[in-house]
A protein has these predicted regions:
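Bacterial Sec-dependent N-terminal signal peptides
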Residues: 1-24
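Non-catalytic cap/lid and distal C-terminal segments of serine-dependent acyl enzymes
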Residues: 19-411
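In a subset of proteins, long, contiguous C-terminal domains/tails are tracked
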Residues: 1, 5-8, 404-412
Length: 412
């Protein structure tokens, strides 16, 4: 009963999750006047769906440039959703920024070179950042994702705003060979100061090839050669992506790899937690101190608080419940229950956790409590915005059958 029913719920959640970009709430479009630019900018604010169901968690910010290029923009959103769904990166607040063709070049060129990039930086990192902090729990970690002109801007903004921009994904960039001495000096200032900072920094840049009509290859190669001659600080991770593709294809090949690389350590805590349980000898308690210390270590690395996610709770609870090495014996379900109850506290929106808790109480013959958690699971399922109505009906039928089994046992 337990394996069949719980597996059904997990599969339902998984397949529903894969149908659309489900890690995020519906986007909110707005137009904001930027006094620094004496112009208006179209923004799209997208928040992670998990935000409304958890507490004590802050979320990194991603500025995703070139919303006006809908194909690349949507692809990048789906890439972020994909990695978030797999817990390969933390849930983030996304700010999509659109540029008019008439202003894109000027706004991405430094003021000292006749542009307004410094004014755009002021708008984004003073006005918009303040707005986000007043409305959402924002973590001290910011990523910029740009292509071509906005990639140039992203790279410049990282060195100009130090220490505000932690990561840059710059696809098919030009002028990385520093077209002017001022930009070069700004970057070298960033390089020299970065070791004093808290947390880690990342710079990813890429190009296609001239043969494939990406004419930024030479400038990107020049920048890569320049970096090879520098003493790169340990706090700065550099990634150079080069593929035999054109100017418009390279962003799709860059963003996925860059984000996976930037947040590679984010997933380590969950993975190392499985090693803890595999080496666990005591069968009377959950070693929370060991688990949490892994998350504290990754938090120190990135410079913002990272907490156990659903992947952690489900993986650890499954390991206890299944007791693969026969270590926990009759305590296995007790330990699994402790983990799941902690999960319910942290993520009260996940209906399947309530149902799993209900099944454990059922096995322990605590029928009233089992019914209580099953009913809570139904209530959460009813409010779920992702699972379709037909799927909810099917899952509800399974839950009702399960609850009928509980009532039958209570009559014996």
């Amino acid at each position: 009963m337990k394996i069949v029913f719980f597996s059904f719920c997990i599969l339902q959640s998984y397949f529903s999750f894969c149908q659309s970009t489900t890690s995020f709430n519906a986007p909110v479009d707005t137009v904001v006047y930027a006094k620094q630019l004496d112009d208006s900018i179209s923004l799209q604010i997208i928040t992670p769906s998990i935000m409304q169901y958890s507490s004590g968690v802050s979320y990194p910010v991603i500025f995703l440039f070139d919303k006006q290029n809908e194909i690349n923009y949507q692809y990048n959103l789906e890439t972020i959703d994909y990695l978030t769904s797999l817990s390969a990166m933390p849930p983030c607040i996304i700010v999509g920024v659109a540029f008019e063709n008439s202003t894109r070049n000027k706004w991405t060129t430094p003021n000292i070179s006749g542009g307004k990039a410094d004014d755009l930086i002021s708008f984004l990192f003073e006005d918009i950042s303040l707005l986000l902090k007043t409305k959402f729990p924002v973590a001290n970690f910011t990523t910029l994702i740009g292509h071509s002109r906005t990639a140039i801007f992203s790279s410049y903004a990282q060195s100009k705003t130090y220490p505000l921009v932690n990561a840059v994904v710059a696809s098919s960039t030009a002028n990385f060979d520093f077209g002017d001495e001022n930009t070069k000096k700004q970057f070298e200032f960033f390089i020299n100061e970065i070791e004093k900072s808290r947390g880690q920094y990342f710079l990813t840049f890429s190009s296609g090839t001239s043969f494939q009509l990406d004419y930024h290859e030479a400038s990107v190669d020049s920048f890569a050669n320049y970096l090879n001659d520098l003493q790169i600080p340990g706090k700065l991770t550099i990634m150079h992506v080069k593929e035999p593709v054109d100017h418009f294809v390279i962003p799709g090949l860059t963003v996925n790899r860059a984000l996976a690389n930037i947040f590679a350590s984010y997933r380590k805590a969950a993975i190392y937690s499985l090693e803890v349980i595999q080496g666990q000898q005591q069968n009377d308690s959950v070693p929370w101190r060991q688990y949490l210390s892994l998350y504290e270590e990754q938090s120190a690395y990135y410079g913002f608080k990272i907490v156990p996610d659903l992947l952690f709770y489900n993986s650890i609870a499954s390991s206890y419940a299944n007791d693969y090495d026969d270590v926990f014996k009759d305590k296995s379900s007790v330990l699994a229950l402790e983990v799941l109850l902690k999960c319910v506290e942290s993520y009260p929106f996940d209906y399947s956790t309530y149902l799993w808790v209900s099944e454990i109480y059922f096995e322990q013959k605590k029928y009233t409590t089992a019914i209580e958690f099953a009913e809570k699971g139904i209530a959460v399922l009813t409010d779920d915005k992702v699972i379709t109505a037909d799927e909810k009906l099917e899952i509800n039928d399974e839950i009702n059958d399960f609850m009928e089994s509980i009532h039958q046992e209570m009559k014996k």
